[in-house]
């Protein structure tokens, strides 16, 4: 048993706290993410799975340290404490492609409480050709399309592909 409260924070602890609520209350599931930028992405994604029985609270593993990244979410204190009431949400980086070549990739692939992007990072979801116009609108607050991003990226890919 850990000496500090943070060492005892686990999926079982969150589950016990959920049991103290009224019977018809929604079950809270804590979702730990890698960085501040990831909170919005995972919040949007997980909100689609909320209903009258459960909701997600998306947060960083620590409010006191500036440690970021997959290691702070998985390998430090949280890894063994994940469960049905506490999950980790991380960028796949190359771990999904490596399919178990490293300790981290084995852990991500084999742990059903670790959710990961199938692309390298969340930025890959946000910056694909069909979404680039929306990204520009959000950045400039101007909805006037000047560039056909889909055609541009198609042409760019056809030029760049033979180089690799």
Q: What does each model-found stretch correspond to?
A:
Residues 1-164:
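Acidic, divalent-metal-binding catalytic cores of TOPRIM
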